[in-house]
Every structure is written in C-alpha cells, then in structure tokens.
Amino acid sequence: MAKEKFVRSKPHLNVGTIGHIDHGKTTLTAAITKYLSFFGRADYTPYEQIDKAPEEKERGITINISHIEYETETRHYAHIDCPGHADYIKNMITGAAQMDGAILVVAATDGPMPQTREHVLLARQVNVPAMIVFINKTDMVDDEELIDLVEMEVRELLNKYEFPGDDLPVVRGSALKAVEGPDDPNDPVYAPIKELLDTMDSYFPEPQRETDKPFLMPVEDVFSITGRGTVVTGRIERGVIRPGDEVEIIGMSYDIKKTVVTSVEMFRKILDEGLAGDNVGCLLRGIDKDEVERGQVLAKPGSITPHTTFKAQVYVLKKEEGGRHTPFQKGYKPQFFIRTADVTGELIDFPAGVEMVMPGDNVEMTIKLIYPVAIEEGMRFAIREGGRTVGAGVVTAIVE
C-alpha cells in the first residue's frame, strides 16, 4: 500500500490550543474534530486519545505532544495539544511544533490563571503571529456579566503582552457540550465550534512559505574536490538556491565573505535549484577549503548578520529529564548549539531579582558567545554541558 499523497490544494497552517490546566484545551480540540467529522474533514479524535500524547524528542528534550489533523473548506490545519504545562513550555521554546496561530482557552468559571499568563508571555517571546480567545465552560456561568468580566480580563492580559487585546476575536461556548452533542451539525451546541473555525480561517494570517523566505543553509561539512573547488553540504533551512546565485558565508568572525554558488548537487545529480528541506552540496567559486567551516551559514546577501550577544527565553531541564542536578549562576559557561555551530557562551545577565536558575525553570537571560554566529530573533538553540543537554532556548532579542 503506497503512502497517501499529501494534497496541497489548500493553504496549510500549524495551530495549537494553549491556556491553563483544566480549562478545556483538549476537550476543545476533540470538539473541533467531532464537528468537522460530520463533513468528512476530520477523524473524530476523543479526549482520551489526544490526552495520551506520544513522546517526541526535540534538541535532546522529551516532550509529550499530540498532532491532530483537520481541514475546513478553505484550509488544512495541523493542531497541536500538549497534556502537561511543562510540555507546552518545552514545545514553545524548542519549536518542536511552531504555531502560525494559537487558540487561547480560558474557562469562564476561573478567568485568566497563572498558566494562562505564562503561555501568553511565551507566545509573545516566540512570536506566535496571531491569537484567538475561546472562553470555555460558559454553560456553567449563569450571569452573562461575569463572562463579560472574564473577557475584559483576558483582553487586558493580551494587551499587556503586546497582542491586540482590544481587537482580537473572542468566541464563547462549551467544548464539553459539543463533544457530548448529537450527530447533527446544525444543533446549537456546535455553533461556537463553527464560529471558532470560521474565525481561524479569516483571522489567522496565511504563513509565508519556507521557499519564499531568503535563502539560508547551515554548513554541515566541507570538501575539496580536485579541479573543481570547495563544496559545502547541508540541509537548506529556507529559500531557494540556483547556480549563479551570490551568497554570503557568515559566522565564526565579523568578517563576511561573499561568493557565488556555481553548482547545486543532490545525490551526485546536478540540480536547477535546491529548495528548503533539500540536502545539497553547493560548489563555491574562489573559496579555499580552510575559508569555510561547519557552524557557519550560507545565506542570501544582507539577510542575516553575525552576533555574539543576545537575549533568550530558556527552559532548563530538570534532573529527571537528564539535566543538571544543581542550579547555576551568572558566569556559567556551557556550550551553545546554534544550527550547526557548537560555541562556548557565558550567561551574563538574568532578570532583576533572579540570583540563580534552578533545573525546571523557564527564564529570560542574556548570553554572550566567545565568537560571532549568524543569529536572528525566533531562532532556537540547545545548551549542553559535558555531552548532555541542560537547556533549550529561543532568541528573543539581539543585543550586539
């Protein structure tokens, strides 16, 4: 049996439910699949099945995460749902499943809670482009004014973290009522689910395709081919490369070298173009083997620059996850794995009032590398010490 081909007739978006524990994230995910299953656009996935999220490893960190697929009339969605709070933090920081849009679930019975805030902060730090609010469990609150109050609080919270809290869409309903509803898509219990899906289709922006972004390829290996020159190999992270394109070699120093890719090859075949996701070899004009090394990147001129100092949101592994057993302070110098670069860096600053960072913490810090690497906001990295992963981070701002 051949694998079913993924039909690209509709734009594809990655979305996810976020919010406080027991506010109904997983029930809402189940309700979406139930409603769409009436139209043959999803397989109904009940709560128990989503909740048994399989383990995945991303940058040496184990995360429990469920991937649910469904489509509306106009779009195809991959929806992620995590069973535990720590899984959400780890997922958002490692980028195991990046989100083009998030559905913030808030229970009308509770209003915004500590994890609601933490997820909103993380969504801001990792640049989730858009957010829709689903106020859940409205059937358990008799007074409409109390729900209005919850909506006001959520909008204020979103404003505080620089989301358009006054303008973004808010849908009210009961995910459980929909999950327990009859087999009739026109039953009123499904109205909020339909409203949510219509809102996702209209409000979540279509993501830019990886091939439309400026070319970037981390250098994995360098070979010298007698009579032909220097070939660098790697997996194209984004964009397109064609023979004759000019590229910059960036990283390891502030000195940026320009060269031209004279040939693009994959499995010893010459390509007209290499695309995001392809593992290729690029032949570089006029570059010696010792002028380029693993850890650098090839990139479209002017699209990325080398830096040493940046701010990052970091998740520090617990000892049960294979991380450190003890806290660390400013001045700690682990290895940073940034794309293919492996570089020593120092933690030079923590937030005010933070003296030390404990295993299991999620904290913003400033990092200074011993030499410059191609860095940009939103980029993910791993922190390792003595051959084991001790943390994962995402760049939130470039300092210098």
Curated annotation (Swiss-Prot):
Q: Which parts of this chain are annotated as the region G4?
A: 136-139
Q: Which Pfam families match?
A: GTP_EFTU, GTP_EFTU_D2, GTP_EFTU_D3
Region (G2) location: 60-64
Enzyme class of the recorded protein, top EC level: hydrolase
Q: Does Protein biosynthesis appear among the keywords?
A: yes
Q: Where is this region: G5?
A: 174-176
What InterPro entries does UniProt report for this protein, alphabetically? Answer: EF-Tu_GTP-bd (IPR041709), EF-Tu_GTPase (IPR050055), EFTu-like_2 (IPR004161), EFTU_2 (IPR033720), G_TR_CS (IPR031157), P-loop_NTPase (IPR027417), Small_GTP-bd (IPR005225), T_Tr_GTP-bd_dom (IPR000795)
Q: Where is this region: G3?
A: 81-84
Query: Boundaries of each tr-type G domain copy?
Result: 10-208
The catalytic activity of this protein is classed by the Enzyme Commission as 3.6.5.3
Return the GO cellular component terms, semicolon-separated: cytosol
| Family classification | Belongs to the TRAFAC class translation factor GTPase superfamily. Classic translation factor GTPase family. EF-Tu/EF-1A subfamily.
How is this protein organized at the quaternary level? Monomer.
Function, as annotated, reads: GTP hydrolase that promotes the GTP-dependent binding of aminoacyl-tRNA to the A-site of ribosomes during protein biosynthesis.
Protein name in UniProt: Elongation factor Tu
Tell me the organism: Thermosipho africanus (strain TCF52B)
The root-end lineage is:
Bacteria, Thermotogati, Thermotogota, Thermotogae, Thermotogales
Gene name tied to this protein: tuf
